[in-house]
């Protein structure tokens, strides 16, 4: 059921928040040995949160919009009093003394914290295999990855361990795992949701967003999380519209642009292409006009991203030196040796690789050739999107070139791993909102996602189109097999 339906049942007393929470905690206990979506399950807190909701309802109080709704939070969002590790040995014992703006707003809306979810270390990866605490399995097939970096959050929703979850998206880290796990994943406009309390990877690209079973649930969560925040100077001071009100509007007469560069990709799986084109035809059947558009520099996005993102990561991760907090190497001969050893032992290989790439790109002899040039190309990519939106309302592409790949398939080939974000990265570079919605399955039964991209702050239109497609296509009648439940 959708969040709105659960809210109604909770308000009517048909189900209690405690019962809903206990159901999901039991589900977590049953399937976690096979999925490993969670790094920490906060069962005691969840039950206490739920009991407070039930007490408020019993006393006749008006319940906030997410009262009693069990959520999971990606473990790179600070939660006061609950460990926030970023799936790294560097922060294995870090307990934040403050709350992120996102989680603060969710708790104020009555949401229940079930726990913190697994991710690629410091959100750097596309499979959740770089986590220092072990990989997460794809609920549709445990021999395949759930995507990344927010693989734990996606898998938790897909396997029914929570009603919805929160992730972060720097180059596709919400949309790609949403596609791989057969759930909805929304990356809002850059600055639409505060990043205060989000552990930084690449500050000009990072954005928080929801995973859910439906577009309507994504709209509900966005409604709570969006809005200005004086603690984040990049957060937009723009009015927050009623996102749910847009869902029922028809798509008739809207222009949907098919980005030709995306459908001409050499590595695009034919099954993915066919499924996504069928999704476009579904929108056409609903009255939308399909228009072929070109974004000539779309394919330059991945090279641009892998200069800018590692450069920002190199600067952001310089703070982890073993002095004030985080992992500290023992018995070092000097401060310099302690810092060097702490970083070498605390960071995994993928994080170290990206720090080195970024440090190189920012070095005195190469900053003009790499970093500044990448920023110039980023501007050109944004201009391509601006030109496209002169003639269409939303853009449509595959979310990923293929379906979820096998565990370990790209372990020795980081470039192949990076290519899984080929189709999602440009929206991050341009700061645009984008959503992945399930649109079908491959012959192996793995989900396929279609990506819709909107113009800046056009989340209402994006959600409108996504919801209308979702309702018409109804591809997600099935859920992952309960293969991990004992007995």
UniProtKB/Swiss-Prot annotation:
EC number(s) given by UniProt: 6.3.5.7
Keyword Protein biosynthesis tagged: yes
Catalytic reaction equation(s): L-glutamyl-tRNA(Gln) + L-glutamine + ATP + H2O = L-glutaminyl-tRNA(Gln) + L-glutamate + ADP + phosphate + H(+)
Residues annotated as catalytic: 74, 149, 173
Domain of life: Bacteria
One Gene Ontology term from the biological process aspect of the record: translation
PROSITE patterns recorded: AMIDASES
Gene Ontology CC terms: glutamyl-tRNA(Gln) amidotransferase complex
Quaternary structure note: Heterotrimer of A, B and C subunits.
Protein family membership: Belongs to the amidase family. GatA subfamily.
Protein name per the record: Glutamyl-tRNA(Gln) amidotransferase subunit A
């Amino acid at each position: 059921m959708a969040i709105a339906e659960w809210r109604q049942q909770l308000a009517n007393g048909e189900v209690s928040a405690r019962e809903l929470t206990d159901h999901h905690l039991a589900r977590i206990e049953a399937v976690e040995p096979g999925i490993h979506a969670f790094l920490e399950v906060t069962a005691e807190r969840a039950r206490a949160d739920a009991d407070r909701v039930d007490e408020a309802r019993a006393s006749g109080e008006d319940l906030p919009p997410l009262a009693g709704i069990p959520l999971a939070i990606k473990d790179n969002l600070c939660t006061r009093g609950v460990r926030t590790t970023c799936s790294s040995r560097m922060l294995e014992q870090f307990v934040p003394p403050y709350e992120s703006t996102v989680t603060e707003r969710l708790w104020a809306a009555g949401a229940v914290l079930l726990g913190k979810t697994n991710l690629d270390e410091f959100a750097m990866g596309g499979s959740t295999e770089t986590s220092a605490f072990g990989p997460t399995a794809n609920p549709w097939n445990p021999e395949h990855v759930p995507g990344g970096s927010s693989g734990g959050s996606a898998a938790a929703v897909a396997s029914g361990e929570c009603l919805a979850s929160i992730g972060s998206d720097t180059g596709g880290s919400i949309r790609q795992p949403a596609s791989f796990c057969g759930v909805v994943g929304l990356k809002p406009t850059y600055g639409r949701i505060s990043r205060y309390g989000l552990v930084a990877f690449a500050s000009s690209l990072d954005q928080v967003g929801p995973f859910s079973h439906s577009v309507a649930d994504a709209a509900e969560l966005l409604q709570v999380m969006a809005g200005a925040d004086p603690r984040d100077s990049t957060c937009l001071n723009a009015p927050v519209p009623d996102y749910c009100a847009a869902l029922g509007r028809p798509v008739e007469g809207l222009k949907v642009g098919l980005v030709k560069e995306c459908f001409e990709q050499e590595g695009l799986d034919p099954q993915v292409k066919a499924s996504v084109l069928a999704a476009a035809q579904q929108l056409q059947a609903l009255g939308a006009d399909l228009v072929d558009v070109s974004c000539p520099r779309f394919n330059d996005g991945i090279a641009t991203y892998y200069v800018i993102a590692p450069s920002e990561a190199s600067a952001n991760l310089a703070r982890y030196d073993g002095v004030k907090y985080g992992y500290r190497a023992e018995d070092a001969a000097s401060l310099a040796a302690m810092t060097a050893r702490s970083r070498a032992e605390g960071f995994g290989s993928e994080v170290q690789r990206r720090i080195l790439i970024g440090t190189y790109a920012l070095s005195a002899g190469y900053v003009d050739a790499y970093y500044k040039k990448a920023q110039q190309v980023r501007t050109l990519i944004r201009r391509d999107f601006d030109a496209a939106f002169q003639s269409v309302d939303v853009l449509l592409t595959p979310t990923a070139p293929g379906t979820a790949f096998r565990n370990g398939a790209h372990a020795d080939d980081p470039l192949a791993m990076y290519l899984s974000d080929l189709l999602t990265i440009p929206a991050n570079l341009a700061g645009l909102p984008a959503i992945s919605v399930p649109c079908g399955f491959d012959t192996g039964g793995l989900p396929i996602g279609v990506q819709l991209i909107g113009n800046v702050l056009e989340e209402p239109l994006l959600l409108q189109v996504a919801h209308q497609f979702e309702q018409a296509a109804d591809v997600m009648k099935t859920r992952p097999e309960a293969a991990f439940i004992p007995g």
